[in-house]
C-alpha cells in the first residue's frame, strides 16, 4: 500500500524489516527444537542465536544474483553467523519459513484490526445513544418512506460491526497456522514433532495436512473477511455522502479550519473522507478475488500465488486498517443537523404517514 494510506503501526508490521525478522524467528525456533531433540548441537544453536543478524539492503543485493529471496536471506544470515550457519534451515524448504512467518504477520494484523473495530464500535454506540430520540425521515429507493430515528442508523452499524468482529476472529484462526513439513509436505527430512513444537513456540496451530505450502483457502477466507468489513465501511460512508448532499444536508463531515474543498469553487465542502473510504473499499474487495484465484495451484505447489500475495495481503490489511480509522474519525466528528431532519420530515406534507392512514381505513367498518 502506498504511504499515503499507511498508518505507522500497521505499516511497521508489514515492513520488509519485520518480514525478515519473522523469517528469522521461524528459523531460530526450528534450530531450538532441533537442539532439544538432539538433531543439531546445542552450542551451535547458542552461536546462531547470538550472532544472527540481517540487513534488508544486503538481502536485496544478494537476491539480484540468486533470484531467490529465501536463499538470499539465509546467505546473509550465514555472513554474520559463521561456521554454525550450516545448521540454519536444516531440513526445511522455503515455504516452511515463508508460510509460517506469514501466519505470524496475519495473526498480528488481526489483533490490530480487532482493536480498530472495537474503537469504531465504541463511537457507534455513543452516537446511537446520542441520537436515539432524533427523528429523521427513512428512505427506501432514495424516496421518503416513514419516520425513523437517526440513532437507529448507528445502532444498525454497531450490530454489523459486531458480526464483523466475530468474522475476523474466525479468519484469524484460519490463518494462524504454521507448517514445518519440508518439500511437498511429506516430512521426508523432518520429524513431525518438530513442526508441532515449533508452532507451539510461535503461538500457532500446526497445519493438520499440508503440501509444500499451507493451502490458500485460509488466505482467501482472510481476504474475503477484510472485503466484507470494507464493504460495510463503504456503506456507512455512502450514507454520509447522501446525507451531505446540498438537497438533503442532514449531516456532514467535520470541516477543519484551513481545509479547502475546491481549487475552483471556494464555497465547496465535499465529503472527501467518505469518498476515500468508498474508493479504498473497492480495492480491498477486488483483492479478495485474487485470494480465491490463488487457491488452485499445481500439484504440491507452484509459485503463481507468491507474487500476488506480496501485493494483496499487505495492501488489503493496511488499507482496511486505514479506512477503519478514517470511519471512526468520520462518525466521531460527524456534524448533524436535527432541524434540517425535521424540515425534511415535513417536506411531503404528511404523505409519510400514508401507511398509518391505510391501516385506519382497513379497520373502518
Say what each PLM segment does.
Residues 152, 220-228, 356-364:
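Short, well-ordered beta-strand elements within core beta-sheets of diverse protein domains
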Residues 107-114, 118, 125, 155-158, ...:
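Short amphipathic alpha-helical segments with heptad-repeat character
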Residues 1-22, 26, 46, 62-66, ...:
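Glycine-rich cofactor/substrate-binding loops
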Residues 130-133, 167-170, 174, 204-208, ...:
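Conserved helix-loop functional segments at active or binding sites
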Residues 1-187, 191-197, 206, 259-262, ...:
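A helix-coil-helix interface module used to build multimeric assemblies
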Residues 33, 76, 80, 123, ...:
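Generic, well-ordered alpha-helical scaffold segments in large soluble proteins
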Residues 195-288:
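Acidic, glycine-rich loop-and-beta core segments that form the ion-binding/anion-interacting portion
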Residues 186, 201, 206-213, 342, ...:
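A structural signal for small-residue-enriched, beta-sheet-centric alpha/beta enzyme cores
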Amino acid at each position: 500500500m502506498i504511504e499515503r494510506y499507511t498508518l505507522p503501526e500497521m505499516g511497521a508490521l508489514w515492513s520488509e524489516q519485520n518480514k525478515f525478522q519473522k523469517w528469522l524467528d521461524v528459523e531460530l525456533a526450528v534450530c531450538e527444537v532441533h537442539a532439544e531433540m538432539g538433531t543439531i548441537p546445542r552450542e551451535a544453536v547458542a552461536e546462531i542465536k547470538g550472532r544472527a543478524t540481517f540487513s534488508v539492503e544486503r538481502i536485496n543485493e544478494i537476491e539480484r544474483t540468486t533470484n531467490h529471496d529465501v536463499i538470499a536471506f539465509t546467505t546473509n544470515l550465514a555472513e554474520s553467523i559463521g561456521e554454525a550457519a550450516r545448521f540454519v534451515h536444516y531440513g526445511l524448504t522455503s515455504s516452511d519459513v515463508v508460510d509460517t512467518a506469514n501466519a505470524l504477520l496475519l495473526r498480528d494484523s488481526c489483533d490490530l484490526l480487532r482493536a480498530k473495530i472495537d474503537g469504531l464500535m465504541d463511537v457507534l454506540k455513543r452516537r446511537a445513544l446520542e441520537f436515539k430520540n432524533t427523528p429523521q425521515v427513512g428512505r427506501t429507493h432514495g424516496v421518503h418512506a416513514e419516520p425513523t430515528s437517526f440513532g437507529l442508523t448507528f445502532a444498525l452499524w454497531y450490530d454489523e460491526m459486531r458480526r464483523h468482529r466475530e468474522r475476523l476472529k474466525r479468519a484469524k484462526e484460519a490463518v494462524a497456522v504454521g507448517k514445518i513439513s519440508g518439500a511437498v509436505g511429506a516430512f521426508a527430512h523432518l520429524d513431525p514433532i518438530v513442526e508441532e513444537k515449533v508452532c507451539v513456540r510461535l503461538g500457532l496451530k500446526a497445519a493438520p495436512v499440508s503440501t509444500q505450502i499451507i493451502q490458500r483457502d485460509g488466505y482467501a477466507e482472510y481476504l474475503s473477511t477484510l472485503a466484507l468489513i470494507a464493504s460495510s465501511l463503504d456503506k456507512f460512508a455512502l450514507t454520509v455522502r447522501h446525507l451531505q448532499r446540498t438537497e438533503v444536508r442532514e449531516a456532514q463531515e467535520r470541516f477543519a479550519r484551513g481545509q479547502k474543498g475546491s481549487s475552483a469553487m471556494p464555497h465547496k465542502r465535499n465529503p472527501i473522507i467518505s469518498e476515500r473510504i468508498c474508493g479504498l473499499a473497492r480495492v480491498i474487495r477486488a483483492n479478495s478475488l485474487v485470494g480465491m484465484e490463488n487457491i488452485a495451484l499445481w500439484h504440491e505447489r507452484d509459485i503463481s500465488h507468491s507474487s500476488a500475495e506480496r501485493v494483496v495481503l499487505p495492501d488489503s490489511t493496511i488499507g482496511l486498517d486505514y479506512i477503519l480509522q478514517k470511519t471512526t474519525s468520520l462518525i466521531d466528528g460527524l456534524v448533524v443537523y436535527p432541524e434540517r431532519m425535521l424540515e425534511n420530515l415535513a417536506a411531503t406534507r404528511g404523505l409519510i404517514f400514508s401507511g398509518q392512514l391505510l391501516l385506519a381505513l382497513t379497520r373502518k367498518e
